[in-house]
């Protein structure tokens, strides 16, 4: 995987709307990183920093509060992982950096990136997530973890129970901040933040930063440095977006069955808006003798993990999911995303289709649109300054 899988051509075109004091560091060597961390970076497959890495890593390592906005597949996770690994002292077995993510899968993925990049540093990093054994969390945290990557509920719980000690924490990272700061997690984040030392550095990372999120960050960030991608750059380049007009909801299923052979050319993800719809569609597809797997937030964590693993390894080729999957989950082979339901929140559109064609691979997104959905589709087009065309007959050629 050359260059950690980042698409250089698309990366060079990203236009940053960034604080004036931010300098660009064209190589990892020029960032004054620890030798053991550099070894981990190169072993991971990175050769040179992506656009967001070349700007954000040094600012974060300097201790600046940072808002970094970059689209999926530009190396966002490695940006803050490298920064955390640079600032922690592995000789002190206490939690020094904390990452909060909106989903358990994302929290686990961040932990594995940290462990891989920190391979030569003897780093301890634990994924502290709901749906798993509390006893295991307590054992790991009592042993001492340099970095904790978790979901807000479980992290807040472990802090309250005094197993996650906060006095040495110097950095808090909010990943997929737009989702985290939506109503669901806002209270829990404030809860966690209250326990952190007053001088804790805050790093906010997300593909989309609506104004209300930026507004809220002022509450716990001091003079943040901003590294922002312009709004109209946000639809991933090289990604073909189509819609299929289905007169009514009932016709979506037949349309999906007609497309099934196309789906299995590579791997595909199908998004529905509710957990119930995911279960319904999965059952209906299986009744019609189609092989599909499915995942949503109601499932036990173990089951979600094994479904993810099967999908990552390519054992299952079509995954039906809710937006729990849409945020930051990196599966290389996905080159087709189907929005069986258009997302109810337009910010989620980019997170969903950002799965397909990650890292510059060709990707196709297909939206099923009933007459009631036309307005939502137009709204998405306007919001992202993009054009979504009617799907051509030869869609299979575009994917293969």
Swiss-Prot record:
Catalytic activity: ATP + H2O = ADP + phosphate + H(+)
Gene from which this protein is expressed: fal-1
Lineage: Eukaryota, Fungi, Dikarya, Ascomycota, Pezizomycotina
Family, similarity comment: Belongs to the DEAD box helicase family. DDX48/FAL1 subfamily.
EC numbers on record: 3.6.4.13
GO cellular component entries: catalytic step 2 spliceosome; nucleolar chromatin; nucleolus
Any GO molecular function: RNA helicase activity
Coiled-coil portions: none
Motif (Q motif): 26-54
Protein name, as recorded: ATP-dependent RNA helicase fal-1
């Amino acid at each position: 995987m050359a260059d950690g899988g980042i698409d250089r051509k698309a990366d060079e075109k990203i236009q940053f709307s960034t604080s004036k004091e931010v300098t660009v560091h064209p190589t990892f060597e020029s960032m004054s990183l620890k030798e053991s961390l550099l070894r981990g970076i190169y072993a991971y497959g990175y050769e040179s920093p992506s656009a967001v890495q070349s700007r954000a890593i040094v600012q974060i390592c300097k201790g600046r509060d940072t808002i970094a906005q970059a689209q999926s597949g530009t190396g966002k996770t490695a940006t803050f992982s490298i920064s955390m690994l640079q600032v922690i002292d592995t000789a002190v077995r206490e939690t020094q950096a904390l990452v909060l993510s909106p989903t358990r899968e994302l929290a686990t993925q961040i932990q594995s990136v940290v462990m891989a990049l920190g391979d030569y540093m003897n780093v301890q990093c634990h994924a502290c997530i709901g749906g798993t054994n509390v006893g295991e969390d307590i054992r790991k945290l009592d042993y001492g973890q340099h970095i904790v990557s978790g979901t807000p509920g479980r992290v807040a719980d472990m802090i309250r129970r005094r197993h996650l000690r906060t006095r040495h924490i110097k950095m808090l990272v909010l990943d997929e901040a737009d989702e985290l700061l939506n109503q669901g997690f806002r209270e829990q984040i404030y809860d966690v933040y209250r326990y952190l030392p007053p001088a804790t550095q805050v790093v906010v990372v997300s593909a989309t930063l609506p104004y209300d999120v930026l507004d809220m960050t002022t509450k716990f960030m001091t003079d943040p440095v901003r590294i922002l991608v312009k709004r109209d750059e946000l639809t991933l380049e090289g990604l073909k977006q189509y819609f299929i007009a289905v007169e009514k909801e009932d016709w979506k299923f037949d349309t999906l069955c007609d497309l099934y052979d196309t789906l299995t050319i590579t791997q595909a993800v199908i998004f529905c808006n509710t957990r119930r719809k995911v279960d319904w569609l999965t059952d209906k597809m299986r009744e019609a003798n189609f092989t599909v797997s499915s995942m949503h937030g109601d499932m036990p964590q173990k089951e979600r993990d094994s479904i993810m693993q099967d999908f990552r390894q390519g054992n299952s080729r079509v995954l039906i999911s809710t937006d729990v999957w849409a945020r930051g989950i990196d599966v290389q082979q996905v080159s087709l995303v189907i929005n069986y339901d258009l997302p109810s929140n337009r910010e989620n559109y980019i997170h969903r289709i950002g799965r397909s064609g990650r890292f510059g691979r060709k990707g196709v997104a297909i939206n099923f649109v009933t007459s009631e959905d036309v307005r939502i589709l137009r709204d998405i087009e306007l919001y992202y300054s993009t054009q979504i065309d009617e799907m051509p007959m030869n869609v299979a050629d575009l994917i293969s």
